[in-house]
Regions:
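Structural signal for interior beta-strand "rungs" in well-ordered beta-sheet cores
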Residues: 97-237, 250
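Terminal amphipathic alpha-helical/low-complexity segments used for targeting or macromolecular assembly
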Residues: 1-97, 220, 226-227, 231-275
Length: 275
């Protein structure tokens, strides 16, 4: 469907001199507009049941190419002033999105109907699906993929991944609850219905240790579906002695048999997770 656009973007990626040609610049802008409308994504689910996703590298390339073709300009809202290449997103009433002052989403970020932006920030290339709340001072980085009915609590940091273009963005799947001041970065993948307790840090290399069985099972950059996760530590020997290393602990599971909200409350009550 977008084969011609993809061809132009790939050629411009290999030869940046082509960006001086207006048809190429128009193609780049068209891709970013489609991302802004949610018709194209920098990453998308291939098999949601298995939490399998694919990265649309050519779309990420278009987002990156958008920066050099945009001129710096002054923007104002009353007495407030900015000087940047990127416009902010507009038309929230028509989009059916609730946006509380002083929330900001950049043009090129898709915000689905019934999403709520408290005073927060959403960067270009991101996808925020329907019913999701981005709470106060939470940030959604470039190209991050946030599913349906997700709650990003106050101060949550969702990292952005533009380059390398083949790298997967941060993915937070449907019905996840990310506790306050938690950080998910470096292309980490939090699968559906997972709960992250307050101050949990998940990076691409974080040891995520399932301690619910007779033996620990360690994941990296991946939180399995319905996991209840809290900050933790493990001991590691160094030349200077033994020290604690930060990790994340899977201490339980949300039950499929219960309603999503009830399941969340049960998880917090049963495992003492602070959010």
């Amino acid at each position: 469907m977008y084969s011609e656009l993809k061809k132009i973007i790939e050629q411009a990626w290999e030869n940046r001199e082509l960006l001086s040609e207006e048809p190429v610049r128009q193609a780049v802008r068209q891709v970013v507009e489609l991302v802004d409308k949610g018709q194209l994504r920098t990453a998308e689910p291939v098999d949601p049941a298995k939490s399998e996703w694919k990265v649309n590298e050519w779309v990420k390339k278009a987002v990156i190419l958008y920066f050099p073709i945009q001129p710096m300009r002054k923007m104002q809202a009353g007495e407030l002033e900015w000087y940047d290449k990127m416009e902010v997103k507009h038309g929230y009433e028509e989009l059916g999105v609730r946006v509380v002052p002083h929330a900001v989403a950049r043009y090129g970020a898709y915000i689905a109907p019934c999403a709520i932006l408290m005073p927060s920030y959403v960067n270009i290339g991101a996808y925020v699906d329907t019913g999701t709340m981005v709470d106060t001072w939470a940030t959604v980085g470039s190209c991050a993929q946030i599913g349906r009915h997700v709650h990003l609590s106050g101060g949550v940091g969702i990292g952005g991944v533009l380059e390398p273009v083949q790298a997967a963005p941060v993915i937070i799947e449907d019905n996840c609850f990310i506790g306050s001041r938690s950080i998910v970065v470096e292309g980490a993948h939090v699968c559906r219905e997972a709960v992250l307790g307050s101050n949990t840090v998940i990076t691409g290399s974080t040891h995520i240790i399932d301690v619910t069985g007779p033996e620990p099972v360690t994941y990296k950059g991946y939180v399995p579906p319905r996991s209840v996760v809290v900050p933790g530590s493990y001991r590691k020997q160094f030349p200077a002695g033994e020290y604690s290393i930060t990790c994340a602990l899977i201490i339980g599971q949300r039950k499929e048999s219960t309603d999503k909200k009830t399941s969340l409350n049960d998880a917090l009550r049963d495992f003492g997770v602070s959010v």
